[in-house]
């Protein structure tokens, strides 16, 4: 379950109601969840808790889906890699699908997790993936050599668009995991695994040197 309250159809603000109508038809998505793409749809119902946040996020979607200088294939490489790098199954899964929609090959999509050793990417695609890793995995610490490689292929406008969109999707991946939305509603796998009954609590005692008499 998401960690925040979900806003139903009757309580949603006008912009959310309009999108609910598109996604869920006449259903209340809290009572009858599910979208045509197979997601529960609770990203929308949780973001609707704050109408301003909902509208701001939707404006971000409209930004990247609008008329941009950046090639949509490069955009989706950045978004999908951001989802993978941040560990968001929701963002990664949704943008694998979106990547097919803009014409990336199945090999390119399936190789995003291990792009460094894949041979299916052009120099500009590799530069975009490396730049995304610098932003997401290194917290914005993009090496000069990576930026120089990107500048060989993209204009300042295209780099600004890429930076904004990747940063936005890094944020969405973090929010999705934090609030346990959609496919990121999973338990943390880093927990203690119980030892057998009667086992010593000193798990590293076998490496101790025997004390000399």
Located regions from the model:
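Short acidic alpha-helix initiation/capping motifs at coil-to-helix transition points
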Residues: 34-35, 52-57, 87-92, 127, ...
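Conserved alpha-helical segments that form or flank metal/cofactor-binding pockets of metalloenzymes
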Residues: 55, 76-102, 106-107
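Helix N-cap / loop-to-helix initiation motif
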Residues: 70-71, 103-107, 155-156
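Acidic/His metal-coordination segments adjacent to aromatic residues that form catalytic metal sites
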Residues: 114-123
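Secretory/endomembrane lumenal or extracellular ectodomains immediately following the signal peptide
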Residues: 1-72, 191-213
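Short alpha-helical scaffolding segments that buttress acidic/His motifs in well-ordered protein cores
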Residues: 44-47, 57-64, 77-83, 112-113, ...
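Acidic/histidine-rich alpha-helical segments that form the ligand environment
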Residues: 122-164
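C-terminal end-helix/capping segment
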Residues: 100-107, 176-206
């Amino acid at each position: 379950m998401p960690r925040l309250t979900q806003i139903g159809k009757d309580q949603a603000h006008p912009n959310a109601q309009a999108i609910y109508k598109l996604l869920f038809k006449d259903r209340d998505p809290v009572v009858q969840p599910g979208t045509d793409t197979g997601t529960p749809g609770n990203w929308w119902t949780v973001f609707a808790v704050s109408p301003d946040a909902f509208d701001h996020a939707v404006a971000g979607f409209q930004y990247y889906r609008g008329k941009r200088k950046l090639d949509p294939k490069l955009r989706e490489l950045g978004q999908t890699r951001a989802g993978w790098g941040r560990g968001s199954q929701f963002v990664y899964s949704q943008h694998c699908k979106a990547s097919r929609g803009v014409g990336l090959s199945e090999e390119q999509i399936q190789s995003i997790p291990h792009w460094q050793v894949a041979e299916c990417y052009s120099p500009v695609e590799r530069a975009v993936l490396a730049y995304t890793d610098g932003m997401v995995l290194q917290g914005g610490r993009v090496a000069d050599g990576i930026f120089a490689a990107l500048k060989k292929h993209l204009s300042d406008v295209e780099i600004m668009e890429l930076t904004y969109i990747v940063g936005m999707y890094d944020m969405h991946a973090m929010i999705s995991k934090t609030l346990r939305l959609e496919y990121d509603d999973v338990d943390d796998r880093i927990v203690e695994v119980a030892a057998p009954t009667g086992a010593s609590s000193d798990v590293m005692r076998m490496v101790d040197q025997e004390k000399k008499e």
